[in-house]
C-alpha cells in the first residue's frame, strides 16, 4: 500500500541516521481527540486545569515543572490547532504515564505514535512533531509517582486510515471509511486496498458540534442545559433516566446529526445501499444506535481506541523494519 510504504520509509531513514541508539523503545500510540484522549488501553477526557495549591488528593494529578494540573475533568475548548498552548503536551505526559504504569515502568525511552486528520496531515505534521519533541528528556509526576522519559522520536499517521489498517487487506475492491470524531468527520475511500488520497475529505462537523446543537435547543425550548457527559451517555447507550422533554430534544438532534452525515456521504457520490461503508471513531456507536439504515453493506467498528491502536501498530511495524525495535 502506497501510504503505508511512505510512512515506513520515513522510519527506515531515521533508523539509518540513528543506528547507534539503544533499540529498546516503548512505542506508545496516542489519539489526541478534542473530546477524549485515547491510548491502546486508556480513555480519558481531554481536560487539563492548573491547580494553584498543593492538592489534597493526587488522583489524575500531573506535576510538571513545579505546577500541578488536574487531568480529565472538563473538556478543553476546541482551537484551530493542537499546538496553540501546552494543553495537549500536558495531556500527552498523562497518557504516557498511564501506559507506562500499565507496563510496570517508571523510566523509559519513548517513541510516540500519533495522528492528524488526513487532509490536514501535510500542513500540521511538522508542527505537531516539534511540539511533542520540544523536550527530549522529561521528568514529571503523575498521581504522585515519578516518571523519567526520553522522547526518542514521533511518528504521525493519518487518522481514519490508522483505525482500519489491520482490516485493509481483507476489504472489498472499494470500501468507504467514515471516521466520526469529536471535531471532524474524515471520509476516506479505499480502492484496491489502498486509500485514495485525492478523494479524502475532512468535515469540521463532529460530535462536539452535535452536542452544541443539543444544548442550544435545550436552552431555546426549556431554558436549561445538559451536561456533555450525560449527552455522551445517551449517544453511547441510546437511553438515560432524565426528563422526557430533554430526552426528546437530545434524540431529535442526534438523529438530525446522523442524517446529515449520511447526506454528506451521498453528496460526495457514494451509494448508501451498495457502497461498503465502515464507520469508525467515537461516532460509530451513534450511527449504529440512531441511524435508519440497517443494510448489509454498512458496518461499525465500535472500539474508540482503534486509531491509537493503529498508530502503535504502524509505528511498531516501521521500527521493526528499520531494526530500531527488537
Question: What positions do the PLM features span?
Answer:
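Ser/Thr-glycine-rich phosphate-binding loops at phosphate-binding pockets of nucleotides
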Residues: 180-186
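Cysteine/selenocysteine-centered motifs that mediate thiol-based redox chemistry or coordinate metal-sulfur cofactors
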Residues: 225
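PRPP/pyrophosphate-binding module of the type I phosphoribosyltransferase fold
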Residues: 187-192
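Nucleotide/phosphate-binding catalytic cleft detector across ATP-hydrolyzing
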Residues: 1-177, 194-209, 221, 229-326
Amino acid at each position: 500500500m502506497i501510504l503505508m510504504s511512505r510512512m515506513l520509509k520515513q522510519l527506515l531513514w531515521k533508523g539509518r541516521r540513528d543506528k547507534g541508539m539503544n533499540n529498546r523503545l516503548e512505542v506508545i500510540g496516542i489519539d489526541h481527540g478534542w473530546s477524549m484522549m485515547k491510548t491502546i488501553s486508556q480513555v480519558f477526557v481531554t481536560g487539563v486545569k492548573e491547580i494553584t495549591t498543593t492538592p489534597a488528593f493526587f488522583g489524575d494529578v500531573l506535576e510538571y515543572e513545579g505546577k500541578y494540573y488536574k487531568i480529565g475533568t472538563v473538556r478543553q475548548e476546541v482551537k484551530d490547532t493542537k499546538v496553540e498552548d501546552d494543553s495537549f503536551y500536558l495531556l500527552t505526559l498523562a497518557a504516557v504515564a498511564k501506559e507506562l504504569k500499565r507496563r510496570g515502568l517508571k523510566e523509559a525511552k519513548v517513541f510516540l505514535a500519533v495522528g492528524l486528520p488526513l487532509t490536514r496531515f501535510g500542513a500540521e505534521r511538522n508542527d505537531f512533531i516539534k511540539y511533542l519533541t520540544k523536550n527530549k528528556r522529561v521528568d514529571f509526576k503523575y498521581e504522585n509517582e515519578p516518571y523519567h522519559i526520553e522522547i526518542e522520536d514521533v511518528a504521525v499517521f493519518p487518522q481514519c486510515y490508522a483505525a482500519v489498517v489491520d482490516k485493509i487487506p481483507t476489504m472489498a475492491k472499494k470500501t468507504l471509511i467514515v471516521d466520526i470524531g469529536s471535531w471532524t468527520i474524515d471520509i476516506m475511500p479505499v480502492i484496491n486496498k489502498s486509500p485514495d488520497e485525492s478523494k479524502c475529505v475532512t468535515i469540521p462537523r463532529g460530535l462536539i458540534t452535535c452536542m452544541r446543537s443539543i444544548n442550544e435547543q435545550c436552552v431555546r425550548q426549556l431554558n436549561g442545559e445538559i451536561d456533555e457527559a450525560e449527552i455522551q451517555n445517551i449517544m453511547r447507550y441510546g437511553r438515560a433516566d432524565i426528563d422526557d422533554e430533554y430526552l426528546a430534544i437530545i434524540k431529535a438532534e442526534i438523529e438530525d446529526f446522523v442524517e446529515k452525515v449520511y447526506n454528506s456521504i451521498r453528496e460526495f457520490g457514494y451509494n448508501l445501499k451498495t457502497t461498503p461503508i465502515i464507520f469508525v471513531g467515537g461516532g460509530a456507536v451513534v450511527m449504529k444506535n440512531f441511524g435508519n439504515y440497517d443494510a448489509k453493506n454498512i458496518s461499525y467498528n465500535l472500539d474508540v481506541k482503534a486509531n491509537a491502536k493503529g498508530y502503535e501498530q504502524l509505528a511498531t511495524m516501521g521500527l521493526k523494519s528499520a531494526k530500531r525495535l527488537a
